[in-house]
């Protein structure tokens, strides 16, 4: 598990949202509390976030964005092509990062081994050290609360930040409407 962050993605009825906390940890020390680990890519039509090694994640963002451009924004095709590249390349297989990517229609988790996972419910995914806490909170809020999509992500990440020592409550979100 990567002890650096928590990223949560949620695809609701009206909006797709990605959010992340701002903490960067090195061992048991907080190096930075306001890092931004999420992005809007492909002309703002796709949201992406990472957990793990920052340098590795930036390389993965760049590679994924090239695949997205090559597939003319088809997220499913882009993640499949990206996964194939990831698995074939000896250097990439050693990267210590995971990504979440989503658009208004699909959401995917890209693992550090090149696996592509679409969440079972098709709408909520989380990665990072506080990922399971954020995922649990998001599922509960999705099931029982009448709450805006962005607020659901913020509240879920806040709960994760209150529990996980590698996650803080300095939360940044991006929304696709």
Curated annotation (Swiss-Prot):
Transmembrane segments: none annotated. Its EC number is 3.4.25.2. GO terms for cellular component: HslUV protease complex; proteasome core complex. The active site is at residue 5. Na(+) binds at residues 161, 164, 167. The keyword Cell inner membrane does not apply. It is found in: Cytoplasm. Signal peptide: none annotated. It is an enzyme of class 3 (hydrolase). One of its GO terms (biological process) is proteolysis involved in protein catabolic process. Keywords: Allosteric enzyme, Cytoplasm, Hydrolase, Metal-binding, Protease, Sodium, Threonine protease. It catalyses: ATP-dependent cleavage of peptide bonds with broad specificity. GO terms for molecular function: metal ion binding; threonine-type endopeptidase activity. Allosterically activated by HslU binding. The keyword Protease applies. Belongs to the peptidase T1B family. HslV subfamily. Protease subunit of a proteasome-like degradation complex believed to be a general protein degrading machinery. A double ring-shaped homohexamer of HslV is capped on each side by a ring-shaped HslU homohexamer. The assembly of the HslU/HslV complex is dependent on binding of ATP. HAMAP family: HslV. This is ATP-dependent protease subunit HslV. It comes from Campylobacter concisus (strain 13826).
């Amino acid at each position: 598990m990567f002890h650096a962050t928590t990223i949560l993605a949620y695809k609701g009825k009206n909006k797709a949202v990605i959010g992340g906390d701002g903490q960067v940890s090195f061992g048991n020390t907080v190096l930075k509390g306001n890092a931004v680990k999420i992005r809007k890519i492909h002309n703002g039509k796709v949201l992406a976030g990472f957990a793990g090694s920052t340098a590795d994640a930036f390389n993965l963002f760049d590679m994924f964005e090239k695949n997205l451009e090559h597939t003319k924004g088809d997220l499913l095709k882009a993640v499949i092509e990206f996964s194939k590249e990831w698995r074939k390349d000896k250097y990439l297989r050693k990267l210590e990062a995971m990504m979440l990517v989503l658009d208004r229609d699909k959401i995917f988790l890209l693992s550090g081994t090149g696996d592509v996972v679409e969440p079972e419910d098709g709408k909520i995914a989380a990665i990072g050290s506080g990922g399971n806490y954020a995922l649990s909170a998001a599922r509960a809020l999705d099931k029982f609360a009448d709450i805006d999509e962005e607020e659901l992500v913020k509240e879920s990440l806040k709960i994760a930040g209150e529990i996980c020592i590698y996650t803080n409550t300095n939360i940044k979100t991006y929304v696709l409407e």
